[in-house]
Every structure is written in structure tokens, then in C-alpha cells.
């Protein structure tokens, strides 16, 4: 009985023992990340690397407004469709925005040669100077420049024509051979446009040009072509059976372009001295213009983000994150978020780092919880926390810096005859996009795995640091906790935390406590052995008495015969 009381007293006394636990921070975060081995791991802190939002507007880029073509196409704008007159004064822009199906393109039907290439060239132009290459009133004294209008290019209810081209017709019943040249003295590339008229019948050809065998010749250092009108009846388009084919060339600085014709020339009126700029482009978008500034524009809307990746749209203009097909790219910076079930004993003991983290420790990632006669409390290990924060911050910044190559990515232009090339280009682009997406996702998975392992290692190192200081002055009780064999006041606890614990100072007290506990264990062990022997003997006696009683009863009623032979 005395031994039992000692055991109970020992257990009750142990409850009052001073303890220190090593643990880590937890909070109410619901952020989840993926690693190589796990999905949807809840963590205390993380950073998002993927931008998935936009404002739905067309915005200025670096303070410069875009050229919004509205109901006009690039062709209608550059040729001077009279319905696009509001655009003629625009000479600089950050990018060009065209709607998917603009109404005002080539008002007089015909073929626009190398149109996709022209769009590609204009996509790298951020401004131009629109100037008269051949002034209307003085360049063509032997030809009429006012009668070349058509109802298909009407403006305000009246027949009109392109504002950058002149339709030259006969004058006084004659169409003399013409020869006109221009020397590029702009010190920039000059875009020159012209056209060739193809009447629907010979009557129109004679009436307009007074010749049946017309030609148009255009020559420069890098361009040389002779055109012959094709007179034929064609299906009506915009109420026209005739056609005008449109052509263009880029004239280098100092180069000369020469026009010769005896009919059917749609002559240049205005040309454009081009200024190319990095980051410009042409996008197709239904978004409306907004009062906003941005660094990155997509057809869906503007993106204001410094993140390295985005999944808004593959076509971008400006300083834009790289497009990937991922739906989630989140990099962990904190720890696994597993708040402990804070079941508290008589003195508020809580679980250590094995069972979960501490929501009560808010000033660090790793730290301690102690309890003694003076009370209990949390304390972060500032040094290990700061080292971890610095290391992870540097890693995240390095990843973002390496992957954050911001650039413009505009779509390539192909005509209807280049569908196979376009399909091949799409497959190549899709392949690159898949590689980028895979690389981005793999990078995040690997870094998340390393970061969580890094945190686990830091907690373990902190535990080993305490264990190496305490040695046999305390015992491990699991869950990251140690129970002291001696009294450990707040000053003692602080010395453990900062690594200055004086082991010899407490070793004698700890030794006596250990011997006392070991003695109680031995005494209680002897009592339990006596009780076990007593129980075994008593059970055997009861069994023998029972067997004797049964045998006597069976002999008395004749069920069992007993013979004793001498």
C-alpha cells in the first residue's frame, strides 16, 4: 500500500515538473501549395506567382495612349478610308487596337498585296510622320485629280475616295504618259502605297484612261514591278464590278522610287516616315478604352502585375509576365500549417512540434513554449527565424527575377494561302507554351518541396540544440518536449533558449531527482512482484480445492469409483 501511494505521489509530482517544448508557428491561413510528393498542402505563408486578373480595358502604356481603330481596319486606316478620318491626325501610339470584324477596310473592293506582312511591319512602329509625297495640286498637271471618286467610298452621303491615294483620270480627253519620282530624304524608312485599277469592261477603260493597253511601273533599289490591268467582268462587291489592287513598299533613306504609267494608276498622295519602337504591336480586341495606365496590355484587358507568370492571354504588349496554361503557381514561404489540438493538462501543457504548430507564437517561425512555477509562455527563436526568412526571401526573389523576363508577344500574320504554315506555327507555339508551363510548374513543385524540408530541418536542429544542452538534466517526453529533473525558473529557461544553459550548475539536483524517481520505480516493482506471486499461489489453491470437491461428489454418487490397492 505504501508503494502505491509513492507511485501516485510521484505521478502527481511529475505533473508539476518544469518543461520546455520546441515547436513552430501556425495560423489560420488556408493557403495551399503543391509539392513533388503532395498536393494541396496547407501552409502558413505563400506567395502567388501567377497573375490571373485583368481590368477589361484598353489602357495607356507608360503614359502613351493606344491607337484604337474603332470600326476601321488597319487597311482602312493606312489607305485613308474616308470613314476613318478621325484617325488621320494620330501620329504616335503605344500599340494599335483593332476590333475582330471592323466595318471600314478597303472601301473599293480589291486585293491588298502582302497585307499580313504590312501589318507585321506596322506592329513594330510606334509613330510616323504623315506627309504629302506627291502634292495633289502640283504633281499631276496633265491629269485630273478631282474626278476619281466612287459611291463605294462615300462620306457624309457623297462619293469620295481614299485620303492617302489619288485616282488619276484623263484630262481634256487625254491621259499622257506620266513619270514621277520621290527621293527619301527623311532619314527614316518611308512607307509608300499605291494601287492599280482593273475596270470591268473596255468601255470604262477607254472613258477613264483613253487607252486600251495601259501599264503601271514602280521601281526602286529594292522593288521593281510592272502591272498590266486585267479588264474583266466580276461579281459585284459593294456595287462595284471593277477592282483596285493595293500595293506597298518600304523606301530606305536616300533611295528613290519612280512611278511610270499611261493609265490605271492609283497614285500615292500621302506617305509615312516610320519610327519603330520596342514594345509596340497590333492586338485584336473588343475591349473599350479606359482612363488607366498599365505596363502590360492583353486583348482581354490590362494587367498591372510584377508577377513572373500570367494565364490571362498569350498575346501581350508591353512589359508582361510570361503566359502559361497553369491555373495555380503558388510558392511556399512559410511552414506546414497544422495547428495543434491544444489539449491542456493541469498546467496548460500543449503539444510540441510533432503533433502540430502553435497559433500562440506569433513573432517567429520557430521557438519555445515553457512552463514552470512562475508561469508559462511562448518565445520565438529570432535568430533561426530571421536566417530562414532571409534565405527563403532571397530564393523567392531569385526565382521571380530569373523567370520574370517581361516582353511583348503578338500574334503572327498569315494570309489565306499560308494556312499550313499558320497551323505549323501554332503547333510550334503550343509546344513552346507546353514547355514553359511544364518548367514553371516543376520549378514551383521542387522549390516548395525544398522549402518545407528546410523548415522541418530547422525545427529538428533547434530541438537538437536544446537536447545537447540539457543532456541528462532533463528527459524527452515526446512531442518535442523536455521535462527537467531540476527546478528551472525564467532565468534558467532563457539560458536554454539563448544557448547559455549551465549544465554543471543543475547536474547535482538533477542526479538526486533521477535517483529518487528510479528508487520509487524499483520499490514499486518489488511490490508488484510479491502481489503477482501471491495471486498465482492463491489461484492454484482454489483450483485444487475445486477439483477435490468435484471428485468427492462423484465418488459419493457412484459416478466415480476409487480403488486403493496395497
Curated annotation (Swiss-Prot):
Post-translation changes: Palmitoylated. In natural infection, inactive HA is matured into HA1 and HA2 outside the cell by one or more trypsin-like, arginine-specific endoprotease secreted by the bronchial epithelial cells. One identified protease that may be involved in this process is secreted in lungs by club cells.
UniProt similarity note: Belongs to the influenza viruses hemagglutinin family.
Disulfide bonds: 21-481, 59-292, 72-84, 107-153, 296-320, 488-492
Top-level taxonomic group: Viruses
Topology Cytoplasmic: residue spans: 551-566
Gene name tied to this protein: HA
Protein name according to UniProt: Hemagglutinin
Function per UniProt: Binds to sialic acid-containing receptors on the cell surface, bringing about the attachment of the virus particle to the cell. This attachment induces virion internalization either through clathrin-dependent endocytosis or through clathrin- and caveolin-independent pathway. Plays a major role in the determination of host range restriction and virulence. Class I viral fusion protein. Responsible for penetration of the virus into the cell cytoplasm by mediating the fusion of the membrane of the endocytosed virus particle with the endosomal membrane.
GO biological process, one term: virion attachment to host cell
Claim: Iron-sulfur is one of the keywords in the record: no
Glycan attachment residues as annotated in the record: 27-28, 40, 71, 104, 142, 177, 286, 304, 498
Signal peptide: 1-17
Originating organism: Influenza A virus (strain A/USA:Memphis/10/1996 H1N1)
Chain ranges on the Extracellular side, renumbered to this chain: 18-529
Amino acid at each position: 500500500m505504501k508503494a502505491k501511494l509513492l507511485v501516485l505521489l510521484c505521478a502527481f509530482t511529475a505533473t508539476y515538473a518544469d518543461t520546455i517544448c520546441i515547436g513552430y508557428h501556425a495560423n489560420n491561413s488556408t493557403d495551399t501549395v503543391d509539392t513533388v510528393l503532395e498536393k494541396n498542402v496547407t501552409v502558413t505563408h505563400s506567395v502567388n506567382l501567377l497573375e490571373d486578373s485583368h481590368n477589361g480595358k484598353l489602357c495607356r502604356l507608360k503614359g502613351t495612349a493606344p491607337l484604337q481603330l474603332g470600326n476601321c481596319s488597319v487597311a482602312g486606316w493606312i489607305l485613308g478610308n474616308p470613314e476613318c478620318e478621325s484617325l488621320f491626325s494620330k501620329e504616335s501610339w503605344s500599340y494599335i487596337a483593332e476590333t475582330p470584324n471592323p466595318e471600314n477596310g478597303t472601301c473599293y473592293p480589291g486585293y491588298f498585296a502582302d497585307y499580313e506582312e504590312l501589318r507585321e511591319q506596322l506592329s513594330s512602329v510606334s509613330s510616323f510622320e504623315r506627309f504629302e509625297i506627291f502634292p495633289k495640286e502640283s504633281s499631276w498637271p496633265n491629269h485630273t485629280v478631282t474626278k476619281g471618286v466612287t459611291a463605294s467610298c462615300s462620306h457624309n452621303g457623297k462619293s469620295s475616295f481614299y485620303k492617302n491615294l489619288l485616282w488619276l483620270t484623263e484630262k481634256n480627253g487625254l491621259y499622257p504618259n506620266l513619270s514621277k519620282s520621290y527621293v527619301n530624304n527623311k532619314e527614316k524608312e518611308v512607307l509608300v502605297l499605291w494601287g492599280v485599277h482593273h475596270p470591268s469592261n473596255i468601255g470604262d477603260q477607254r472613258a477613264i484612261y483613253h487607252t486600251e493597253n495601259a501599264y503601271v511601273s514602280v521601281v526602286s533599289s529594292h522593288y521593281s514591278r510592272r502591272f498590266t490591268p486585267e479588264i474583266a467582268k466580276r461579281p459585284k462587291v459593294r456595287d462595284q464590278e471593277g477592282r483596285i489592287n493595293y500595293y506597298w513598299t518600304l523606301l530606305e533613306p536616300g533611295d528613290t522610287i519612280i512611278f511610270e504609267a499611261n493609265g490605271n494608276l492609283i497614285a500615292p498622295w500621302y506617305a509615312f516616315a516610320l519610327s519603330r519602337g520596342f514594345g509596340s504591336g497590333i492586338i485584336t480586341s473588343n475591349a473599350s478604352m479606359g482612363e488607366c495606365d498599365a505596363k502590360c496590355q492583353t486583348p482581354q484587358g490590362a494587367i498591372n502585375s510584377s508577377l513572373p507568370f500570367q494565364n490571362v492571354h498569350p498575346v501581350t504588349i508591353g512589359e508582361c509576365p510570361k503566359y502559361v496554361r497553369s491555373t495555380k503557381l503558388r510558392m511556399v514561404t512559410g511552414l506546414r500549417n497544422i495547428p495543434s489540438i491544444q489539449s491542456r493538462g493541469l498546467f496548460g501543457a500543449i503539444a510540441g512540434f510533432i503533433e502540430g504548430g502553435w497559433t500562440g507564437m506569433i513573432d517567429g517561425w520557430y521557438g519555445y513554449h515553457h512552463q514552470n512555477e512562475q508561469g508559462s509562455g511562448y518565445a520565438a527563436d529570432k535568430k533561426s527565424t530571421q536566417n530562414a526568412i532571409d534565405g527563403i526571401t532571397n530564393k523567392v526573389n531569385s526565382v521571380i527575377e530569373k523567370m520574370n523576363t517581361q516582353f511583348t508577344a503578338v500574334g503572327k500574320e498569315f494570309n489565306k494561302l499560308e494556312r499550313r504554315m499558320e497551323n505549323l506555327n501554332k503547333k510550334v507555339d503550343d509546344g513552346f507554351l507546353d514547355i514553359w508551363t511544364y518548367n514553371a510548374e516543376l520549378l514551383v513543385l521542387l522549390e516548395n518541396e525544398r522549402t518545407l524540408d528546410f523548415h522541418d530541418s530547422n525545427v529538428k536542429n533547434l530541438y537538437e540544440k536544446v537536447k545537447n544542452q540539457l543532456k541528462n538534466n532533463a528527459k524527452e517526453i515526446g512531442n518535442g518536449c523536455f521535462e527537467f529533473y531540476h527546478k528551472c525558473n525564467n532565468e534558467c529557461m532563457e539560458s536554454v533558449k539563448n544557448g547559455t544553459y549551465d549544465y554543471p550548475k543543475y547536474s547535482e539536483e538533477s542526479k538526486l531527482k533521477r535517483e529518487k524517481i528510479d528508487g520509487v520505480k524499483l520499490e514499486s516493482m518489488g511490490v508488484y512482484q510479491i502481489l503477482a506471486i501471491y495471486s498465482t499461489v492463491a489461484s492454484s489453491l482454489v483450483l485444487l480445492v475445486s477439483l477435490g470437491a468435484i471428485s468427492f461428489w462423484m465418488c459419493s454418487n457412484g459416478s466415480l469409483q476409487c480403488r486403493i490397492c496395497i
